[in-house]
């Protein structure tokens, strides 16, 4: 059987298993090739093609239909999209991991991505019931799922990666799904660029890293961290974290933005080492 035919029937199998979410195009649009054109435009504009942003989806569909109907390539029909700035929150272009996955997200249909992600989750030892719940979670677009899964899959040898997927199920909205995605990316970045993480450890609803030199690494993709009740509870949990049989010499906090003076003061008072942007 030719590869294209095999891929087609494999994709149909994914379609019949769980259906598509609200942020995904219909099967008809996928099979006639429109969705592939739309993904090209989204990739060119640097936005999430599966975003729930209605303004973005409307404008993106308009541009993609024009290009699809006229057979015009992305390079020949560039035009601004209203709402793209609103969707920029969901598009992270600066991370090395995301850059390396752009072609995967561009070329693969949602069913293809779901297959790839399922295989990687199985390899990580995630139970089938958890895999199903994660891959059909309404808060996660195929982009969120794919980047998160690939970030963890690339951290080969790190223990408890399957626990991260379980924690990620706590997400109720797209913003929270994006938060878990970015946390996975940041842990991956620390693991590959700073020093290797030995295992992932649960702390409340999140996961932190534990290195071979006995350092706890917590990552927070936040622009500005205020001192509020959640900050108080989270920092207290990190400061008091007790890993049976595994001593903790230092606890590091990595944020993509910065802390308010009050938050920095409180974190430092608890012995937490903060790394700001």
PLM features: residue spans?
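Membrane-inserting effector segments that mediate pore formation, membrane fusion
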Residues: 1, 59-98
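C-terminal low-complexity, largely alpha-helical membrane/lipid-association modules
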Residues: 1-69
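Membrane-engaging insertion elements
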Residues: 2-3, 89-129
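Glycine-/small-residue-rich active-site loops that bind phosphorylated ligands and cofactors
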Residues: 26, 225, 259
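Acidic-basic catalytic patches of nuclease active cores, encompassing PD-(D/E)XK
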Residues: 119-206
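Conserved catalytic cores of phosphodiester-cleaving nucleases, focusing on short active-site segments
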Residues: 177-246, 251-253
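Domain-level recognition of nuclease-like catalytic cores that cleave nucleotide substrates
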Residues: 254-277
